[in-house]
Amino acid sequence: MKSLRLVFSLGIFFTCLLQAQEERQAPPTEIPDFSNLDEYIYVPKSTMLFGFRNISGPKTSFSGKGKLALEDKSGSATGSNEFRTYHDGSVAPDGRTTVSESSDGLSVSFPVPNDGKTNTWAYSDDKQFTSDGYMTFHNYSAQIIDTNIRSLNAGRSSGLELSVAYDMGKAFKRLDWSLIAGVSLNDIAASTNDKVAARLTTVTDTYNLFGQRPPIAPYSAPSSVSSSVTNSDGTTSSDTADNTTLLGNAPLARNTTTITDSTSVDNRWKLKGSYFTMRAGPSVTLQFTTRFKASVSAGLAMVYAGSNYTVVESFEPETGAEIKETVTDETTKFRLGYYADATLQFDATERTGFYVGAVYQATGSYDQVIATANANYVSKIDLSNLNGLRAGMTFRF
């Protein structure tokens, strides 16, 4: 009986001991609550905008003066047998010779005595032969004295733009604000041509033809003519005879005339380049729906512009070829200003969308100058009132 009570007592003791050990064990692992999973999802804070920008061209103006003149190689006014070059021809020392036989039987050539004539000359236009039978040669120059300023709006240009906006949070209940920075590239292209006022100077040298009428222009002396001759044995051979028209080897007179007109000289101004815009500022966005929103932005803009300025001067004289001169200059400039834009944006997906908007930009102006010994031209490029449209795609990340 005692043994039974002992066994029963030990059973109760071990039962209580096991129960106490189970109570001291760690509680079972709880299943995580995923009801607030949205708090752990990454929300994109940045938006990249990539597209094109079509913007009005800068206002440009052109002005300046220049000189068109070939190097004067007409020689002295009265000297004989000189090398002379004109715009419409040339006169050189006489090249005629006589042939004599030396004591040893050899043929020797000697220059003919100076008889006031030359057989080496050329002319290019029939107008040089005067009605009273003389030959004239000319050198021309044009001093451009035009004071007009010609203004022109450069054509619109389309270029690429890239910008990134970083969401800074709520500004008001329905307004978000962000910081935006971007770059864009657009062209500069303007050209015009016009007649310009100029002072025209003509130097005319008159030469004696000794009653001869020269061949039709263009003509170059000495000249010869070939003919076919039949020999006594029936064969043929070619015979060459000199038919040069002789000219006086010194000018009879030199005359200089100067007139002013606005029809003989034509200028063409051309400006070609591009400008790179960097801009940064705050942006405010109004959310209409979950997909549709509008934003406005304004801030600083800096422009790096590079342009090539070319002026082509041309003068069509009465005789001879056109006289043309081209002068050019290249320059680069930095300019600081401001911008403003308004944009509508539609989100097609959570990450991508489309945008369209209007832009305004004012970044000052700069002058480009061509300065040479014979030209001084100025072009003004005004980048202070540019406006246009922008459109493209958005990417959130």
Where are these regions (language model features)?
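Extracellular/periplasm-exposed beta-strand and loop segments of Gram-negative cell-envelope proteins
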Residues: 63-66, 127-156, 188-274, 304-335, ...
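Cleavable N-terminal export/targeting peptides
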Residues: 1-43
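Residues on the lipid-exposed face of transmembrane beta-strands in outer-membrane beta-barrel proteins
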Residues: 160-168, 181-183, 278-286, 298-302, ...
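Transmembrane beta-strands of outer-membrane beta-barrel pores
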Residues: 52-58, 183-189, 276, 300-308, ...
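Outer-membrane beta-barrel "beta-signal"
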Residues: 22-26, 383-397
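Outer-membrane beta-barrel domain signature, strongest for Gram-negative TonB-dependent receptors
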Residues: 33-64, 182
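Surface-exposed strand-loop-strand hairpins of Gram-negative outer-membrane beta-barrel proteins
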Residues: 56-157, 194, 333
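Short loop/turn motifs that connect adjacent beta-strands in outer-membrane beta-barrel proteins
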Residues: 33-46, 165-179, 190-192, 287-294, ...
